[in-house]
């Protein structure tokens, strides 16, 4: 399983709407997922040379909380704190690799991983009664607000969620990953932590996603400039494994009628082979990859 499909599979097992897309019993799914991908609290990405990453740890925490598995939640949290929470702030290094002298080859964070970790910790305290996790959730949320937001070059009062604390930003041009915008998590964390900027980032993020949908293309990465959207300098400009999460997060945030959900449905057209959906394409509509993996087809069924 690749890094992105691991994320997709985790999310597809974690929401009531997406559980309905599967025939198996959800608790059995969780146990199978845990046995396959979790080792002593480490969520393993087997097809990426066994690395672990902050997104996987965040989703693992969210799954464990959603299924009421306190033991697994504690183990995933403990591993995360010991191995990824190594920065001077409350954010995580995004990647851990086994069998290396330096297990952390890149100390930069990935904001979506921090967002989901904080949200899982918040839910653990608020919804599961594991209240000792609440304080950590609020501290992470405050550092996301402090370090991972930047003004939209077109509207200074519209905060953009950055892909990382050290991500490229300037007054005239800001790099974003639209799939990092998870409105529900941003709003709940902002309200709990007393950080209105996170709530504003959710609101403005939905506006940005609607603007992207109006262009007819939802990219993995895009630059926001004073003149509008532009191809990013560092990344390919395409619909792909990152952007697949946009409709998932909007649906999870009760925004099923959002224009980006409708746009994503048009992107996820049928592939050339039966049962396959398009998961990677260019702005011109050239299909680069299609897949029949359960997570991707579940998203397609969800938004159709």
What residue spans do the PLM features occupy?
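Short glycine/serine- and small hydrophobic-enriched flexible loop segments
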Residues: 61-66, 116-126, 184-191, 248-252
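Charged catalytic carboxylate motif
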Residues: 59, 72, 116, 136, ...
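N-terminal export signals
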Residues: 5-23
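Alpha-helical solenoid scaffolds that mediate protein-protein interactions
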Residues: 33, 67, 80-83, 87, ...
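N-terminal carbohydrate-binding/catalytic regions of secreted carbohydrate-active enzymes
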Residues: 27-111
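Substrate-binding cleft of extracellular glycoside hydrolase catalytic domains
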Residues: 91-143
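Extended ligand-binding clefts on enzyme/binding-domain cores
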Residues: 24, 28, 50-54, 108-112, ...
């Amino acid at each position: 399983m690749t890094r992105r499909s691991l994320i997709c599979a985790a999310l597809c097992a974690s929401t009531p709407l997406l559980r309905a897309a599967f025939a198996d019993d959800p608790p059995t799914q969780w146990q199978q997922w845990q046995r396959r991908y979790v080792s002593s609290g480490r969520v393993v990405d087997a097809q990426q040379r066994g690395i672990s990453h902050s997104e996987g740890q965040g989703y693992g925490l969210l799954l464990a909380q959603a299924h009421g598995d306190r033991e697994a939640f504690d183990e995933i949290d403990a591993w995360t704190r010991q191995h990824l929470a190594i920065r001077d702030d409350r954010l995580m290094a995004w990647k851990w690799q086994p069998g290396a002298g330096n297990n952390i080859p890149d100390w930069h964070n990935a904001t979506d991983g921090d967002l989901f970790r904080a949200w899982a910790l918040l839910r653990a305290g608020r919804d599961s009664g594991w209240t000792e996790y609440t304080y950590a959730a609020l501290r992470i949320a405050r550092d996301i607000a402090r370090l991972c937001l930047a003004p939209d070059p077109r509207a200074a009062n519209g905060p953009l969620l950055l892909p990382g604390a050290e991500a490229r930003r300037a007054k005239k041009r800001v790099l974003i990953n639209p799939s990092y915008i998870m409105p529900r998590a941003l709003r709940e964390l902002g309200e709990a932590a007393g950080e209105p900027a996170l709530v504003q980032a959710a609101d403005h993020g939905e506006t940005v996603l609607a603007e992207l949908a109006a262009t007819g293309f939802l990219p993995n990465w895009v630059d926001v400039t004073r003149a509008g959207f532009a191809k990013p300098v560092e990344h390919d400009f395409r619909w792909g494994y990152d952007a697949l999460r946009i409709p998932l997060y909007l649906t999870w945030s009760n925004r099923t009628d959002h224009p980006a959900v409708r746009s994503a449905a048009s992107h996820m057209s049928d592939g050339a082979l039966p049962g396959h959906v398009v998961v990677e394409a260019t702005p011109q509509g050239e299909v680069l990859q299609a897949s029949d993996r359960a997570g991707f087809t579940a998203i397609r069924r969800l938004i159709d």
